[in-house]
A protein has these predicted regions:
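Short inter-helical turns and helix N-cap capping residues of alpha-solenoid HEAT/ARM repeat scaffolds
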Residues: 82-83, 118-119, 150-151, 181-182, ...
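Residue-level detector of extended alpha-helical repeat arrays and alpha-solenoid scaffolds
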Residues: 86-87, 123, 155-156, 255, ...
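Short beta-strand-turn/beta-hairpin segments enriched in glycine/proline and small hydrophobics
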Residues: 176-191, 206-226, 247-250
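Short histidine-centered loop motifs in beta-beta connectors
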Residues: 185-200, 228-235
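Alpha-solenoid repeat junctions
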Residues: 94-101, 130-135, 162, 166, ...
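A structural signal for short beta-strand/turn segments enriched in small hydrophobics and glycine
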Residues: 198-207, 236-245
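N-terminal intrinsically disordered, acidic low-complexity segments at the extreme N-terminus
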Residues: 2-34
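Amphipathic alpha-helical scaffolding segments comprising HEAT/armadillo-like alpha-solenoid repeats
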Residues: 38-39, 64-78, 100-116, 134-148, ...
Length: 308
């Protein structure tokens, strides 16, 4: 009986050798393919997968601001202050109805109440929304309070909304948008920061950490979107309460909105602050340069028509 080649015998039993002898030297011998066993997903795994997908969808669905809300939903969401996104969703839905001129819009007392809420997100959204009904005196009075809010983002929204009321009370705040915002600290200690000048910032971006004498750490976050203009307190330096740490340039959208507002309520003495944006010495955006040019022309034209 002829045996298999020695190369196939080393360390292998005869039955394994017989299975592996099909090769180029023995084309008449077929290699037996191993049986493939398919694993079937068990019922519990499928159920868990379905629940995961459904849960993710429901989370998205109930937090997606594009979803229409009924009157009952809006009333419920406005008082659900444990879930800020629900409150904001309701406010957005009200804004959309106001923008469409829907005469059935209600909830004005709730909106004014949110304008006095300690949560910044509620105040800034309420300030923005109230500009969509310039006939409401209760909104007007609420905005006059919000334009003095401690948070700059709330003041800015209120100032822009007041323009719709043809009220120039927010003019100083609109001019402030054109200038770098100074970030100060209420804490004393050593600064630690890795941000570089020119870094893009979102509202809430961590600007620095301050290690106090008692070793506790205080975080300093950006109150506004924009770009880091100048670092005053460098990493490793010590600061005291009220000291300037850095300055922030406003983002393009804020600049554009401020310039649009000043086109309506700006004064001739505001022109020198606007012209650098028109000639491109401050920013290179064509959008900003164009709007700044239009704003200067609007202010000058209004001054000529109404000389003092």
């Amino acid at each position: 009986m002829r045996s298999a080649p020695d190369a196939h015998r080393r360390g292998r039993p005869d039955d394994e050798v017989n299975r592996m002898t099909g090769n180029g030297n023995n084309p008449e011998v077929k290699i037996a393919a191993p049986e493939v066993k398919r694993l079937r997903a068990s019922g519990p795994i499928l159920i868990l997968a379905v629940l995961f997908v459904v849960g993710a969808f429901l989370t998205w669905y109930f937090t997606w601001f594009g979803r229409d809300l009924s009157d009952a939903d809006i009333s419920q969401y406005l008082v659900d202050q444990k879930h800020p996104r629900r409150v904001q969703h309701a406010l957005l839905q009200i804004q959309q109805r106001l923008a469409r001129g829907d005469p059935t819009v209600k909830w004005y007392p709730q909106i004014v109440g949110l304008a006095n809420h300690p949560e910044t997100e509620f105040r800034l959204t309420a300030a923005w929304l109230m500009g969509f009904d310039s006939n409401s005196e209760e909104f007007h009075q609420a905005l006059l309070n919000l334009v003095r809010d401690p948070e700059p983002i709330v003041r800015r929204n209120a100032a822009l909304a007041l323009v719709r009321f043809n009220d120039p009370s927010g003019r100083p705040e609109l001019l402030a948008i054109l200038n770098p915002y100074v970030v100060t600290t209420a804490a004393e200690g050593e600064v630690a920061s890795t941000l570089k000048e020119g870094s893009a910032l979102a509202r809430g971006t961590l600007l620095a950490r301050i290690t106090q004498p008692d070793k506790k750490t205080v975080e300093v976050r950006s109150p506004l979107p924009g770009k880091l203009d100048r670092v005053v307190a460098t990493s490793g330096s010590r600061v005291a309460p009220g000291v300037a740490m850095m300055t922030i340039n406003s983002d393009e959208d804020s600049l554009w909105e401020a310039l649009r507002g000043l086109a309506l309520i700006g004064e001739p003495q505001d022109v020198p602050a606007i012209e650098p944006f028109a000639n491109g010495t401050v920013v290179e955006s064509d959008r900003i340069k164009q709007q700044a040019t239009l704003t200067v022309k609007a202010i000058q034209s209004r001054a000529q028509q109404n000389p003092t």
